[in-house]
Regions:
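Anionic, Ser/Thr-rich low-complexity intrinsically disordered regions
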Residues: 1-74
């Protein structure tokens, strides 16, 4: 968003990434329960999880510089 600090942006990426991973996990489960192929959905989930790890590592690096708590809203 416009006017976000790097710390705010990193926190938002972590928050939104968690939601994406959770939703993709639901999709994989729904496909499996419905008897549909899950390979592509699982591949996307692996990619989202890897991206989430990068977001979290980035947040940790920023917090290390700022000295602020990682997931607080300030």
């Amino acid at each position: 968003m416009v006017g976000e600090t790097q710390l705010q942006l990193a926190r938002r990426h972590v928050r939104e990434g968690r939601a994406r991973v959770a939703r993709q996990q639901e999709i994989v489960a729904e496909l499996r329960e419905g008897g549909y192929p899950t390979e592509i959905a699982k591949t996307l989930l692996v990619t989202l999880e890897a991206t989430q790890r990068l977001h979290e590592e980035h947040l940790i690096r920023i917090v290390g510089v700022s000295g602020r708590p990682a997931l607080s809203q300030s």
